[in-house]
Amino acid sequence: MKPHLKQWRQRMLFGLFAGGLLFLLIFIYFTDSNPAEPVPSSLSFLETRRLLPVQGKQRAIMGAAHEPSPPGGLDARQALPRAHPAGSFHAGPGDLQKWAQSQDGFEHKEFFSSQVGRKSQSAFYPEDDDYFFAAGQPGWHSHSQGTLGFPSPGEPGPREGAFPAAQVQRRRVKKRHRRQRRSHVLEEGDDGDRLYSSMSRAFLYRLWKGNVSSKMLNPRLQKAMKDYLTANKHGVRFRGKREAGLSRAQLLCQLRSRARVRTLDGTEAPFSALGWRRLVPAVPLSQLHPRGLRSCAVVMSAGAILNSSLGEEIDSHDAVLRFNSAPTRGYEKDVGNKTTVRIINSQILTNPSHHFVDSSLYKDVILVAWDPAPYSANLNLWYKKPDYNLFTPYIQHRQRNPNQPFYILHPKFIWQLWDIIQENTKEKIQPNPPSSGFIGILIMMSMCREVHVYEYIPSVRQTELCHYHELYYDAACTLGAYHPLLYEKLLVQRLNTGTQGDLHRKGKVVLPGFQAVHCPAPSPVIPHS
């Protein structure tokens, strides 16, 4: 009996060993995969990004996270990444040409990833960029038919269920591209998360064409717009008509006749009683260059201008306008070095961190300051309760530097610009003043025969990096939350006389100055007999 029991035990142990070995082989077979490929997350890329801790104080733009710049400023090519992790807006000249020619494919893409909930980036960015950029190229169809297994016209297609070798190879290539892109995003880490752009290629293309609306914005920006419309902090009461039917020539003539640059001249209360007539510059801003300037540049502070190599072109203009605390030192290759006019908001004058009193940024240039005022442009009310008290530092600066041209924009000029934007937009826009960028553009149009504006409407380098000189990311910097930026850009796009190539590659629009605009004389009023 014992020999039989011993033999039975040996067989049982052998069976267990064989079963365990078989299980191990099956387990290894099914779990063998690329170790570099991450496990899919139940959250989308954008939703994961939202879970990151928000650092710093809330900025003027709703929901923005601010990271202070490192000491000594930023190096444009070391401190800041070149493009967002998916590489969706970084393209060489060849890719750009392909992109421009594949325009038909854009119009049916989704606009913002947050619009449709938990979908991966692949729902909005093509898996295979080469395939995407090649679409619409001459000979593309014949090439694709040969390499991707598509039948030529008149040839029968593959049978259902058949998988040609070329099609299998294409799938393998796409899989490899997908793995490489995912590993690249992981390697970018937090910087990549922050640089993820909520603007899809489709939206950017439609912005270039002037065919976008607020309904295409992500939910956060839509909510911000609704909140500002409800709050109506400045008491806006628009009584005009909202339409967008004017031609470019009609719109230019409207701007020329109504958007007349106006600054405080000290003749109105309460400034007249405070002696401002002697304080403000004797020569008005509009008369500093009575003969006009031939060609001018307006340089936005957008992060998209990094790696543009536009500095030499910008400095070639007769005059250059810059904004707020945007520096040139260390960024000359991209933004140039020349500064003629600097637009500054009231925060620059009141916040000690901007060093308005002693910084070289604000010396040897024409300064133009502004502060949000009530829509009624009640100067007494504004003087008593400005958004930021720019009046005291203005007085001090004028007393110390009486020879430097320094102006404060009149609220009526700013709100006149807002009225024009609203009149030429069918949607209700935010009841807040236009951005410094739009104000600066209109000022230079009044002083120059031709105005070249850089990165106001973004180029293919578009990024959520708000300013090229500080680490601060938010889509609102491009599309607007407080300011009606989206509608400003649509209006400027309608005025653009430059080429689509310059708009795509350089983010440059070319606008005629008011001196170069020829408008019909108003019809004389015939008295009734």
UniProtKB/Swiss-Prot annotation:
It catalyses: a beta-D-galactoside + CMP-N-acetyl-beta-neuraminate = an N-acetyl-alpha-neuraminyl-(2->6)-beta-D-galactosyl derivative + CMP + H(+). Glycans are attached at residue 211. Its EC number is 2.4.3.1. Keywords: Disulfide bond, Glycoprotein, Glycosyltransferase, Golgi apparatus, Membrane, Signal-anchor, Transferase, Transmembrane, Transmembrane helix. It is an enzyme of class 2 (transferase). The chain crosses the membrane at residues 12-32. It is found in: Golgi apparatus, Golgi stack membrane. Disulfide bonds join 253-519, 296-448, 466-477. Residues 169-183 have a biased composition (Basic residues). One of its GO terms (biological process) is oligosaccharide metabolic process. GO terms for molecular function: beta-galactoside alpha-2,6-sialyltransferase activity. This is Beta-galactoside alpha-2,6-sialyltransferase 2. It comes from Pan troglodytes. The gene is ST6GAL2.
